[in-house]
UniProtKB/Swiss-Prot annotation:
Gene3D superfamilies with a match to the protein in the record: 3.30.1370.30, 3.30.1490.10
Top-rank taxon, per record: Archaea
GO cellular component assignments: ribonucleoprotein complex; ribosome
Family of this protein: Belongs to the universal ribosomal protein uS8 family.
GO BP term (any one): translation
Signal peptide coordinates: none
Protein name in UniProt: Small ribosomal subunit protein uS8
NCBIfam families the UniProt entry points to: PRK04034.1
Complex and partners: Part of the 30S ribosomal subunit.
SUPFAM superfamilies noted in UniProt: Ribosomal protein S8 (SSF56047)
Gene assigned in the entry: rps8
Species the sequence originates in: Thermofilum pendens (strain DSM 2475 / Hrk 5)
Record's function text: One of the primary rRNA binding proteins, it binds directly to 16S rRNA central domain where it helps coordinate assembly of the platform of the 30S subunit.
Length: 129
């Protein structure tokens, strides 16, 4: 029984990155996982990914590029205002301008830099560097 599918997906990606694999399979799939993977793809941390409907919750095959040093979920999922991102960057990222925080906003899942540009707050989901 999986309680947090996003945490399971990100730990699968991290484990396969450490082992030097080129692909990994994430299951079950969800809209949130697909949105987070799309954000990681736009930021250049992973390659393409493919959704496979197997009739049991679906799978996602992710092509890895070897650019992730650390990825993880942020628990509990803290609410963040548009002017509070710097404090959370210091908490979860190793240095300034290195890595991303992934945020769920009313306009969709995006990086903390995109949320700052658009003047949006949201809920912290994950970090990657």
């Amino acid at each position: 029984m999986m309680l947090d599918t996003l945490a399971n997906a990100l730990s699968t990606i991290m484990n396969n990155e450490v082992r030097g694999k080129k692909q990994c399979v994430i299951y079950p799939s969800s809209k949130l996982i697909v949105a987070v993977l799309d954000t990681l793809k736009r930021s250049g941390y992973i390659g393409d990914f493919e959704l496979i409907d197997d009739g049991r919750g679906g799978k996602i095959v992710v092509n890895l590029l070897g650019r992730i040093n650390k990825i993880g979920v942020i628990k509990p999922r803290y609410p963040v205002k548009k002017n509070e991102f710097e404090a959370w960057e210091r908490e979860y990222l190793p240095s300034r301008d290195v890595g991303l925080l992934i945020v769920s906003t009313p306009k969709g899942v995006m990086t903390h830099r995109e949320a700052k540009e658009k003047g949006l707050g949201g809920v912290l989901l994950a970090y990657v560097y």
